[in-house]
Amino acid sequence: MRRFLIGALTSASALAMGVHSAAAQSTPTTTLDEVVVTGTLIRGVAPTGAVLTTVTNADIVKLGAVDTSQLLGALPQDSAFNNRPQVGSFGAFQTVNAPLLRYLGGGSSGSNSTLLLLDGVRLPGMGVQQTSADMDAITPGALQRVDIVPDGGSATYGADAVGGVVNLITRKSFDGLEVGGHFGGADDYHQWDVHATAGKTFDKGSAWISYDYSHHGLILNGDRDYTHNLNYTTRPFTGANLTCNPGNFTSGFTVYPIANGAPVVGPPNTCDNSQATTFFPAESRHSLLAGFDYDLASWLTFDLRGYYMHRDATNDGGPNFYSGIPASSSLAGAALNGTAAGIFTDPEFAHMYGDTTTKTWGVIPRLKAQLGHDWQLDAFLNVAEGDARSQSQTAGGNAPVLAADAANGTFNPLTGAFASTAAGQAAKAIQANYYGFSSGKDQIVNTRAVFDGPLFSLPGGAVRAAFGGEFMHEEFTQRNGNAELGDFDSIVPHSVTRKVASGFGELSVPIFGENNRIAGIDSLTFSAAGRYDHYSDFGGTFDPKFALNWNPVSWWTVRGNWGKSFQAPSLASTAGAIPPGVVAFPAGIFGANPAFPNTAGKTVLLLFPGGGVDLQPQKAKTWEVGTDITPPAIAGLKAHLTYYKIDFTNRIATPAFYLSSFYTLYPSSYIMNTPSAPLTTAQIQQYIGAAYNAAQVAQYVNNPSSVYALENGLSQNLASTTTSGLDFSVDYQHPTDFGSIFAGVAGTYILTYDTQATPTSVIQGLDANSVAHLRLSTTVGAQIGELYAKATWNRSGGYKIPATAGNAFQSNVAPFNVINLAFVYTPKATSGALAGATFSLNIDNVFDADPPYFNGSNGGQSGFAGFTLGRFAQLGVTKKF
């Protein structure tokens, strides 16, 4: 990897050395010499057969967005809609805010089904067990706009563009100075940010730099009255935790509450430890983005973008607990023999505090050459890195050492306290400094060259084409384990690499156009694209796409497309990054294979935990058809409607080996030891050969008859998702004497959302997946002279809950309705303190609505479905010089 990085940086330096300074010249503040179009590689044409949604720089100001991820949260097609993305929560391996269109999720692949780009270039992955790019690595103030295409795009961009493509478009140039910031707060919460952009344009180019610092505080679950971790199977609801203070003592299957330092007969001590845990982590972030453009010659342009982000998140994991620690008979009583669980009572490490640090940087030098006859070469080099690190006090402490402490009397598991002796205090210090540590570093070197231009002319217009090639080298390195503070280097790193070589082409054919239009066909354009990607770890995949735009009249478009896309398995989820282990446990403990019910004296060998072996790409077929209208009879009105369907197969998932139906649901995830096909030593050795601890089960390898089955609990290509729905929007703007009034509605209605854990498992629909049919955003507002005012109603629809033991007292989740207000005041003054100033006020969740009640755990949330900070007010000011 080092050779690739050195070579890449050397190339970038060589390009930069060819740039010469020129005399400064006054130019407009922002110019766009060439509009970058997302969804196609052909200049001058919009993506055929698809809807392109754009969030402009002005929209960013109106939203009061501090994070780029907040921009997507305003779109009903994104999973963050009517929600707020959050990262760095305690113990989480998900350390980024990744875009997620069509609610497809990343599954267990460690990558994302929505592709994130910066000026059409991939961002590095960032995470510990995933390599999704982070939207918030790029500050909103540095963006010209954000393009969103909620449609399969692998034929153009390659991997991960299944649910769609999000392209962050940076400023082309900037002249002057802009400074600003925001300050806002909610109950028990505050946040603020400051930003500055400075730049200069000159006769042959421009240079600019944008910096942003933001900070927000921490919210505990106890700061919000709707979040709890309760046992919802009984009434009244009680705390779901048994690790309490005082705790509990378990002997066999009987739980004894601990009272006055001893176990007694009675109902267990229960508690809700979530109230002292993080609901929203504290975070501080530095972001930097710089741009440089220079015309090397009349036909050759050099472009350079560089970015850096550093983010620190702080979390409180709540009370630290011990579990499964044996209690000596002198402590527990001679009649009892068992284990104790409770909360440490020593304040030095009574809580599990954690920190997550993420850093990312990238350098993108680019050359654009005009080759004549309207042909262009666009070539870039992309060198980037994402680094995530997380450390936290380990839940349960150093269990083997703690068990020894309990046995020798330095730790009392019935009270959670260490002895006051020197030995007891030394034992406490060891536990207080015992941390879990995990890190992931994703490094990419990526280069691409695209030729595009006209081939020939038809009566309908010029047939244009684009073709080219791309190469990427990626390396991922992970550390994951427990160690004392200052000794994290003792955790062995694991690295894995891949190379990707790609070739692609695209064609746009205007069959009817301005010169040959006829009645009923004002224009008709067909496009075709295809891309072949060859991965060094799993081979090749080809993804085509065909699209059509038909305009019966100039203001009415009918469009459609069909294509294939894929999501590559993340390097972070492979066995190379996470070496698998093997576990031996008694057969029948989770249930037996109905065909072979005799489990007596047998043992199951399970590959778990660890990364997947021989993972293949997750593949999708996508198609959509829609229509757009801008009727001249109703000036200011525009509307669109799209039907889409996605068949997403071969999805990466982890088999549920703990289910009694495992042998029925996952027939490809085990090998039975049967009289007709007995396992051999060689088979067992081959099956568990990749496990780092294979030597620990040698007794079963040498005695195959004792093995009931070989089971694979690692990530595999098993699952599928089929979803369909309607996207719609209607917008109207009407000029008035005082400015204008406007109103709009946008939403998505999910018709189907069917998942299967395996090809043979039961199909789970919308309700079983906790997916609402409707997500809707309605706006109304006005431009009154210098004042812009808008009210937004965001609605996430309710859904039914399948009857289970965990939610026996609830049959449906109610809708979630939130009202937001936005005001922007832009004085027209051309001189004085108000010249170039903009003031904003945002009030989110005006009526302080809580998310709807939910009787159980929903995606890690207990007692509620959704997320809100509560009523949140924020003031902002920006000044241009």
Residue map of PLM features:
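C-terminal beta-barrel architecture of Gram-negative outer-membrane proteins
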Residues: G581, A743-S831
